[in-house]
């Protein structure tokens, strides 16, 4: 008998269809029609963005001062050595199982190799480090040569450019880009499934592959947990107390947008670039589109990236879409600040 529902069906089945090495296929069902893709896409994105891995972000080589140096007695130059190093996937044993909410989790490891040898990733295994792709080549050391180097390995997620890791480096270390994500591939398919003879239900099949730093099924569960926490905040806060008032200036973070750009601690180059076109307040940057910001005279890539990172830290990524009411309210607030000649 047909019924008119007042609540969606809750999925009750999760099955591991295949598991081989670092790859797993997982099935979740049943979902109401249209629900499967609604949930599958953000889970896929979170797997790619929030999965935690390990990467070297600092390198110190004895006798080397920058990445364009040569390595005495080593076939590869420093640039190629770094490229090979980035292809090696590490597990920092001391950091496994530590609370991921803790920031700047790292280990430092020292290596010394002497004499003729084909140095491979497996040679970096130690009491502190496990290599998951041991056959990757690293360097060719000639007879009577010695290679001494140290690595700083961090636990993290996503991709972190060397411009950011530079701030974490002790003296003498070269900063490296950090590619932390352990996810090599994640795709999903949506299939129809019968529920009590009704074919209008759906099933999600995830196909997940990692690089070996993390078990793919554990990575999936972790992504779902992140998603649950992200959405859970809406259930924890009283909606009545955060209802939109129609005046953007009433938001708690409106003060951030009325702050002068000096508060962003920009480099002199960035500050001068904005100052020359009359940008005084953070809110003026938030109102600019990505194209407008990139089109500012003398706005190079490094300056743009620096501003974008600062805005992202404030919770307003470049190109943030504000409602017409929010834009109008913010513009009025900035006009008042201009009239007063400073923050109110």
Curated annotation (Swiss-Prot):
UniProt cross-references to SMART domains, sorted A to Z: RPOLD
GO-annotated molecular function: DNA binding; DNA-directed RNA polymerase activity; protein dimerization activity
Chain positions covered by the region annotation Alpha N-terminal domain (alpha-NTD): 1-238
Entry EC no(s): 2.7.7.6
Biological process (GO), any one: DNA-templated transcription
Domain of life (superkingdom): Bacteria
Keyword Cell inner membrane tagged: no
Keyword field contains Protein biosynthesis: no
Stretches the record annotates as Alpha C-terminal domain (alpha-CTD): 253-344
Known function: DNA-dependent RNA polymerase catalyzes the transcription of DNA into RNA using the four ribonucleoside triphosphates as substrates.
Family designation: Belongs to the RNA polymerase alpha chain family.
Domain free text: The N-terminal domain is essential for RNAP assembly and basal transcription, whereas the C-terminal domain is involved in interaction with transcriptional regulators and with upstream promoter elements.
HAMAP family: RNApol_bact_RpoA
Subunit field text: Homodimer. The RNAP catalytic core consists of 2 alpha, 1 beta, 1 beta' and 1 omega subunit. When a sigma factor is associated with the core the holoenzyme is formed, which can initiate transcription.
Name of the protein described by the UniProt record: DNA-directed RNA polymerase subunit alpha
Protein species of origin: Helicobacter pylori (strain HPAG1)
Gene label: rpoA
